[in-house]
Structures are given as structure tokens and as C-alpha cells.
Amino acid sequence: GKRERFLSSGLDEQILALYAQGNSIEDVKRLLHKMLGVDISAGKISQITDKVLPELQEWRTRPLESFYPVIYLDAMHFKVRKDGVYENTAFYSVYSINWSGERDLLGLYINGNEGSNKWGMVLQDLKSRGVQDVLVMCTDDLTGFSEVITQEFPSTVVQKCIVHQMRNSMKYVDEKDRKKVAADLRKVYTSTTEEAARSALAAFGVTWGKKYEYIVQQWESKWDELMAFLDFPEGMRKMIYTTNP
């Protein structure tokens, strides 16, 4: 139908979501450039919003499935000019993947700095639209995030994003070591059993523990949530352990 045609491209969805959050056409133009490096004219943005606006609210509040196998929660950070002052802002996206591997954008939200309480509001929005149960929620490493998920969806498995974790781990690694450190860490999360993954982390510790003790500590302290995907069939694993599907 008409709505599907206009919501068919990811860019249209981003424009509509930003506009729906109360940003002006000029703000939307600036945000798209900042977030995606995309330059799009104010006229084109108006064209998209004018055509779809009557149905936008319907899209934002549309009923969702009661159950999803996997939901990804991710935030992008950028600065927005408000009353002449630049403020840090988080842009939240919520995606699902169904059993056929099809991806669906459930919601886009824009709201101040990222914080676990903001994510609580996002999760409550999903519940108010009919979501009752989620098998796995994939998240970044925000403090308090897991507790918020458990509060709203007590039986959901929390999977911390391996991509985010790798980024954090590699932050202070010397240039000359980067390739080898990344390869050795890859052995941890590509293991097919938890036992093999623990062995790979132990081997990493022997090789690099002295120089990069913080990496070993990071993985050990978050082990259960980083390795949650190992409890699922191999076909599902890669789909689970990253918030960047």
C-alpha cells in the first residue's frame, strides 16, 4: 500500500522518525548529514514528510507481534543544536529478526543522552504496542541496561554485543599488536562450545595477559552475557551476537 511504498527505504524511515520527534525540516537536514553523511534538500524532506505524515503516527504506534526471537537495541550519538546550543543526543533504533531471518524496524526514538532509564521508556513503548516476550535482546554495554531489560522482560536472555566489546577491548592496544590481539580474541567468540571459548580466553591470557590485563578482565566480568549466544543453535548465533545485523 501507500505507506509501505514511502517507508520502503531506510532513509525515508530516518527522515520520518526525526521529523516525528518534533525536529524542524532544517534540523532533520542537519541531523541526516551528521548521522549518516547524507545531504538531502529541505524540499525533498518536506516532500517525504507531507506525503506520509498522516500515516506516520499510525506507523509509530502500530501493533507489534506478541513474540520476537531476537530484538536489537542500539544507540547512535551525535550533537544537536537546540536554541543555538549544541547538546549530546542519542538516537535509538529497535530492530527485530524473525525466524525466517527477516529484519523489521520496530521503532526509532530520539531522546537526550543514552541512559538505561531512557531504554526503559523504549521497552515500555514496545510492551504498550503488544510485545509480551522476546527470546534474546542484543545490547551494547550500557551500565544498568541488563537490569532494565530484566525488569520489563524477566525471561529474556540478554546478549551483550560482541562488536561493541571488541571495539572496547581494542581501544588501548598498540598498533603493532592489533592484528594478533584481534585474531586471538576472535577465537573466543567463534568457539562452538563454552568450554572451548574459556580455553581460548585462557590462552589469550597467557599470551597477552601481562600487557593487556584489562581485556581479560573485561571479558571475564561480562562472560555470561557476552557468551549467551552459545546456548542457541549454531545457525542463530551470528544473528544474535551483534547489534549491527
Question: How would you describe each model-predicted region?
Answer:
Residues 136-143, 148-184:
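Conserved beta-strand -> loop -> alpha-helix junction used to position metal-binding or nucleic-acid-contacting
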Residues 190-245:
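Acidic/histidine-rich catalytic cores and adjacent linkers
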Residues 101-102, 162, 180, 225-232:
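Short acidic (Asp/Glu) and glycine-rich catalytic loops that position anionic groups and cofactors
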Residues 67, 176-195:
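A polyampholytic, Gly/Pro-enriched intrinsically disordered region
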Residues 1-6, 35-42, 47, 51-139, ...:
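RNase H-like nuclease fold core
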Residues 9-22:
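Short, amphipathic alpha-helical "recognition" segments used to contact nucleic acids or chromatin
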Residues 16, 166-170, 233-241:
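A ubiquitous short alpha-helical element
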Residues 26-37:
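DNA-recognition alpha helix
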